[in-house]
Design a protein with these regions (language model features):
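Redox-cofactor binding/interface segments in oxidoreductases and associated redox assembly factors
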Residues: 2, 182-183
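Generic domain-boundary/flexible-linker signal
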Residues: 11-13, 71, 170, 192, ...
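Substrate-binding cleft of carbohydrate-active enzyme catalytic domains
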Residues: 1-155, 159
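Surface-exposed extracellular loop regions of Gram-negative outer-membrane beta-barrel proteins
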Residues: 159-166
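Flexible, acidic glycine-rich loops studded with aromatic residues
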Residues: 164, 172-179, 186-241
C-alpha cells in the first residue's frame, strides 16, 4: 500500500495549519501545481515502478487518502476544505459538490484510459480518521465512502478502504461485496463487527506494526523477533479469525 498524500499533525508545527507539512507525490496534469516540489513520482515512473513490482510478484496498491489526511488538497484548493472551527484544514468538505467534482477528476486522471497510471488490480481510497461529530457528518461520510468504492469499481479496480465504520456507525449503506478493508484500529473498525457485515479484512494493527519515528505513540523501530514470536496476521488484537 503506497500512500501518495498525507500531512503532519498541527501540534508538531506550533498548531499552525499554514506551517504544517503536507504533500501529494504524484504528477498531475489535471491540476498543475498540486504535486509536491520536494519529491514526487512522474506518471511514467509510477507505471514503471508498479510493473517492476508485479514482475517480482508484488502488487503496489496506490492510495489517495481522503476525505481526511487531505491538507495537500485543501491547501491547493481551499474552497474544498473544512475550516479549523469545523474539523481542521486536513478534512475535505464532504458537504460541498465542488469536493466531489475535484476528486472525480483527480481519480479519473489515474484510473481511466488505455494505459492507466494505476496499473494493478486495487485502489485504496483512504477513508480513515474523518470526524464523526454528529449524525449528519457520519451519514455523509458513509455516502462518500460508498460513492468512491463504486467509483473505483467502475474502472475495474478492487476498492480498498481503511476501516472506519465502527467510528462512523449509521444508516447510509456502504458497499460490502468485493471491498477489502484494512483493520488497523479496533476503535475505528471493530473486527467482529466488520466480519459480521461481510467485509474481507486485512489485519494491520497499528500498535503492533506502525512505525512513526519520534512521534511517541507508535514504534521508532519494529521488534521483529517479538512480532514473529507473538503475533500472526489472523490476530486482530484480541479477535482471531
Amino acid at each position: 500500500n503506497l500512500h501518495l498524500n498525507d500531512n503532519g499533525f498541527t501540534y508538531f508545527y506550533d498548531d499552525d495549519w499554514d506551517k504544517t507539512q503536507a504533500a501529494f507525490r504524484l504528477e498531475s496534469e489535471t491540476f498543475p501545481g498540486l504535486t509536491a516540489r520536494d519529491g514526487s513520482y512522474s506518471k511514467d515512473d509510477f507505471r514503471d515502478f508498479q510493473r517492476y513490482a508485479l514482475s517480482r510478484g508484488v502488487e503496489v496498491i496506490p492510495e489517495i487518502d481522503v476525505p481526511a489526511h487531505s491538507l495537500a488538497f485543501t491547501r491547493f484548493r481551499p474552497s474544498i476544505g473544512s475550516t479549523p472551527e469545523e474539523y481542521g484544514k486536513d478534512h475535505l468538505n464532504i458537504m460541498a459538490e465542488e469536493t466531489y467534482g475535484f476528486l472525480d477528476s483527480l481519480f479519473t486522471e489515474y484510473l481511466a484510459g488505455p494505459d492507466p497510471v494505476f496499473v494493478g488490480s486495487r485502489f485504496n481510497i483512504g477513508t480513515d480518521e474523518y470526524s464523526n461529530r454528529d449524525s449528519v457528518v457520519v451519514e455523509k461520510f458513509r455516502y462518500f465512502t460508498d460513492r468512491y468504492i463504486r467509483f473505483a469499481e467502475k474502472y475495474g479496480k478492487t476498492a480498498m478502504v481503511w476501516g472506519s465504520l465502527t467510528h462512523a456507525k449509521g444508516q447510509q449503506p456502504v458497499k460490502v461485496d468485493g471491498v477489502e478493508m484494512i483493520v488497523w484500529s479496533n476503535g475505528f473498525a471493530n473486527p467482529q463487527e466488520m466480519h459480521d457485515l461481510g467485509y474481507k479484512m486485512v489485519s494491520m494493527p497499528d500498535q503492533i506494526l506502525y512505525i512513526v519515528p519520534h512521534a511517541g505513540y507508535y514504534h521508532d523501530y519494529l521488534d521483529t523477533r517479538d512480532i514473529y514470536d507473538t503475533w500472526a496476521p489472523h490476530d486482530f488484537r484480541g479477535f482471531t479469525f
